[in-house]
């Protein structure tokens, strides 16, 4: 049998019900790797197919059932186990088991978080307004199959030659840390160019999962460059560079956590960073803005990391609550906004606040998707009139200049030529993977990358997935070009030196 229709059906079912694909596999046939094996060309028996179909039929997606995870205190272990389950408990066993599987993926601490109910109420608020590019699985698939992070780090590193840092430290702000791949690579480049200079590096990231991934990459950075102060925060663009919030209500709930790492090996640093997991799980929380559907923090958090044995050297640059200046030498603004957001929004809410954080001689490098590449050919084969990249660098710089007004007189706005501004990144494939018959896993990865970059919403994806012709469009583009690549464009805003 052809597996593509079944994979599409499972994917759509999981999206509607709100299950991860691994959870679906465990719930349906007790195999969490079911979907991944099918995508990699695995086979199933007719009996297994019947079990999968039977599970979806017994738990229809159309009823709007959602899995709700709530906190509660675990039941005491000494409760009377001799009393058997009630009839009500027996009738809910199936739903509780399914909910528990979901909790393993949604909850960072199963000892504190348990499933208490499955609701049949349809969701109508913005929290259920799922956006494709916020999906963790698809985000991680994109960053691990494409070289964008590498190329962005290479482009940012070119700006280091133009910096003229002043004592006491080279100051860098990353306006969207993501999984930390770009920042870690840039930190290596910084050490290569400025091996003895103290670093103050601050990064904004609201996603708990991305903060975890970032922290996994920095232990060796403290070993190679001990004169480093690393700060992570979930504050908004207007507040994050100065590590202070303007709202009195938010300021009263601010969590400021300083960690002086002991020892002198990457292993000891990693152990102490990993031990921060309970702190992160308890404090790095986000909710959904009911008006915009975007993520906002529950409380502002600042996490400060540095080596204890270098505290004396780093004392002048360790940030203090309420007394942190911006004055950054380099600001990295890599994909910091939605592609389809208005030019005015990008200029006013994102770029302008970051530009104001530049110190004398400081440079902001902005990077966003450009289009005009094979990936957009895939999108246009499915949605011929779709144009996700509505703002080019020229229009954005003009809007930022207007927004800043007189405050922008000492700034240079550098759009640069296409030859210098544009750069390409690729999806990783072997030549044999795009010649002749292209495997399903390669097609799915290419399709995922194309619609992730184009930020296609789920509402438009559902009918396309149901038709199933999107893989044919993807196959045609891959065979025509011998692979898949994308273009980003960059721009620089620099402040004049005194």
Question: Predicted regions: what is each one?
Answer:
Residues 36-53, 433:
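Short, basic-rich loop-to-helix N-cap that marks the start of a DNA-contacting helix
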Residues 77, 94-138, 266-286:
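N-terminal, positively charged/glycine-rich alpha-helical extensions of SAM-dependent methyltransferases
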Residues 122-167:
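Class I SAM-dependent methyltransferase Rossmann-like catalytic core
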Residues 125-127, 188-326, 449, 456-466, ...:
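Class I S-adenosyl-L-methionine-dependent methyltransferase module
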Residues 167-180, 202:
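Conserved class I S-adenosyl-L-methionine
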Residues 324-325, 345-360:
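A short glycine-rich, Lys/Arg-flanked "PGG" loop and its adjoining helix->strand segment in the class I
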Residues 361-369:
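Conserved beta-strand signature within the Rossmann-like core of class I S-adenosyl-L-methionine
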Residues 370, 374-478:
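Substrate-binding/catalytic lobe of Class I Rossmann-like enzymes that use SAM or dcSAM, i.e.
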């Amino acid at each position: 049998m052809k597996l593509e229709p079944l994979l599409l059906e499972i994917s759509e079912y999981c999206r509607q019900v709100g299950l991860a694909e691994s959870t679906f596999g465990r719930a349906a046939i007790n195999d969490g790797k079911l979907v991944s094996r099918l995508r990699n060309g695995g086979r199933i028996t007719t009996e297994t197919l019947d079990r999968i179909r039977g599970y979806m039929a017994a738990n229809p997606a159309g009823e709007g059932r959602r899995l709700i995870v709530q906190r509660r205190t675990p039941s005491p272990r000494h409760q009377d186990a001799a009393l058997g389950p009630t009839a009500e408990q027996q009738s809910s066993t199936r739903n509780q088991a399914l909910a528990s599987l979901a909790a393993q993926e949604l909850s960072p601490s199963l000892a504190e978080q348990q499933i208490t109910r499955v609701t049949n109420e349809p969701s109508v608020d913005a929290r259920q307004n799922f956006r494709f590019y916020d999906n963790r699985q698809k985000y991680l698939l994109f960053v691990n199959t494409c070289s964008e992070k590498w190329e962005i780090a290479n482009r940012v590193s070119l700006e280091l030659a133009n910096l003229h840092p002043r004592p006491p430290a080279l100051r860098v702000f990353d306006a969207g840390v993501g999984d930390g791949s770009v920042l870690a690579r840039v930190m290596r480049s910084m050490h290569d160019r400025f091996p003895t200079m103290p670093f103050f590096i601050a990064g904004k990231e609201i996603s708990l999962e991305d903060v975890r991934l970032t922290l996994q990459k920095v232990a060796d950075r403290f070993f190679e460059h001990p004169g480093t102060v690393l700060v992570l925060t979930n504050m908004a663009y207007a507040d994050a560079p100065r590590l202070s919030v303007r709202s009195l209500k938010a300021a009263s709930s601010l969590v400021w956590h300083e960690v002086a790492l002991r020892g002198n090996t990457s292993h000891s640093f990693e152990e102490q960073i990993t031990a921060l997991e309970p702190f992160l799980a308890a404090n790095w929380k986000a909710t959904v803005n009911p008006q915009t559907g975007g993520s906002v923090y529950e409380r502002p958090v600042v996490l400060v990391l540095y080596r204890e044995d270098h505290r004396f050297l780093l004392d002048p640059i360790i940030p203090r609550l309420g007394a942190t200046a911006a004055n950054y030498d380099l600001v990295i603004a890599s994909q910091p906004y939605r592609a389809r957001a208005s030019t005015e929004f990008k200029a006013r809410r994102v770029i302008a606040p970051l530009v104001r954080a530049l110190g004398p001689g400081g440079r902001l490098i902005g990077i966003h998707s450009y289009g005009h590449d094979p990936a957009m050919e895939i999108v246009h084969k499915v949605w011929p009139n779709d144009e996700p990249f509505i703002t080019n660098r020229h229009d954005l710089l003009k809007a930022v200049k207007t927004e800043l007004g007189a405050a922008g007189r000492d700034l240079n706005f550098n759009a640069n030529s296409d030859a210098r501004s544009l750069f390409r990144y690729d999806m990783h494939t072997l030549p044999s993977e795009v010649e002749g018959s292209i495997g399903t896993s390669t097609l799915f990865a290419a399709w995922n990358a194309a619609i992730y970059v184009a930020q296609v919403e789920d509402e438009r994806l559902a009918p396309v997935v149901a038709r199933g012709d999107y893989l044919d469009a993807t196959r045609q583009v891959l065979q025509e070009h011998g692979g898949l690549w994308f273009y980003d464009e960059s721009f620089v805003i620099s402040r004049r030196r005194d």
